[in-house]
A protein has these predicted regions:
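Residue position within the beta-strands of beta-propeller blades
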Residues: 68-69, 113, 163-164, 216, ...
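Blade/loop signatures of beta-propeller domains
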Residues: 16-40
Length: 352
């Protein structure tokens, strides 16, 4: 069985050499009520002591700390305060460190790290490993030869673990909080309602009056898809042109990093769109309201609707390379993590 308990703490000592950081930029990006000043150097650290490769995802813990995961095994996890000061770092073996979710059991915070090399690891916030979920073949779900490259997790109200196998099978796999397999959700890779083209992200949406639902990314199809927690398809939220990463809920709004953007082809009388190509270094952030309407695209074009149809969204300002995640603090500032961005540290967007 690949659900394993681990008692060891994997911690890397660090030395944080404080240097003066540039003042906040006067440049304002975004639209409507969601505008931000750009602070590109907010998360910069001494590269010799605390290097990064890809800054993949970030979460906010109950202490107000910002916790980031990346794929540099000198320090997979960086913990910042809101000023950009490094508080801690740990993790030396997550070569595919990619997804990061946080869950509180009522008293303590726990992290779920997705390593795209084939595992999901539950840890404490100081790096102690508590559980590992490995290849689904151990549960009779897939054959051993079936690729398993998890990209994201979401934790249900009862502690169930939903794993998006975004770089592998394109299913979402549901486990109990103790790591027992329940079901697989979706129909694998494809364009049908219950299928995904890169199931890159997943989150629990508690904003509605009814039961919580799953929002699952279909990145190459430029959309999120909504399912019940038991895996029944509900609806599609199209975001033409935007190769979105995971959905992030904060209050009534939905945020996502757009890894890159592209012109799309609209089908006559059909809400489905097809990207024509992917353009490198064309990322931005997109923000949707509770009804699923795009209200702001920091770094991107102003959202435009024609006859109720959202038009193609593209990068407008060359501030970002590839936005891989966005984290929101209690003051509604944004922190943007990037993939393939010349080893850039997280960028802060201050709400104005």
């Amino acid at each position: 069985n690949t659900v394993k308990a681990a008692a060891g703490i994997i911690v890397v000592p660090h030395f944080n050499i404080l240097t003066s950081k540039p003042k906040l930029s006067d440049e304002v990006i975004g639209h409507g009520d969601f505008k931000y000043k750009v602070h590109k150097s907010w998360g910069d650290l001494d590269r010799a002591m605390t290097p990064v490769n890809n800054c993949h995802e970030m979460v906010l813990d109950s202490k107000g700390r910002l916790i980031m995961v990346g794929d540099d095994t000198h320090n997979n996890v960086l913990i910042y305060d809101k000023s950009g000061k490094l508080l801690d770092s740990w993790g030396v073996r997550y070569k595919g460190g990619h997804g990061l979710s946080i869950w509180n059991d009522g008293s303590d915070d726990f992290l779920f790290i997705c390593d795209t090399n084939g595992s999901v690891i539950k840890t404490t916030t100081d790096g102690r490993e508590l559980m590992l979920i490995g290849h689904p073949s151990e549960y009779g779900v897939f054959e051993k030869e079936t690729p398993f490259h998890p990209t994201e997790t979401a934790i249900g109200p009862n502690g169930d673990i939903y794993i998006a196998d975004g770089y592998g099978s394109n299913y979402v796999l549901q486990f109990t909080k103790d790591g027992e397999f329940i079901r697989k959700i979706g129909g694998g890779r494809g364009i049908e309602d219950n299928q995904f083209l890169t199931a890159h992200g997943v989150c629990i949406d508690n904003r509605g009056k009814g039961d919580p639902t799953l929002l699952i990314t279909s990145r190459a199809a430029n959309c999120f898809k909504r399912f019940t927690l038991e895996g029944k398809y509900i609806e599609r939220i199209s975001l033409p042109g935007a190769f979105i990463c995971r959905p992030v809920i904060h209050n009534d709004n939905l945020y996502s990093g757009v890894c890159w953007s592209s012109e799309v082809v609209f089908e006559e009388g059909n809400s489905k769109t097809h990207p024509t190509q992917t353009n490198p270094n064309s990322g931005f952030v997109t923000i949707l309201d509770k009804k699923g309407k795009v209200v702001s695209n920091p770094g991107g074009t102003q959202p435009t609707y024609k006859k109720g149809e959202l038009q193609t969204m593209l990068q407008e300002q060359s501030i970002f390379n590839h936005c891989h995640d966005v984290c929101i603090d209690n003051d509604e500032n944004l922190y943007v993590c990037q993939w393939n961005a010349n080893k850039a540290y997280p960028i802060k967007l201050e709400r104005v």
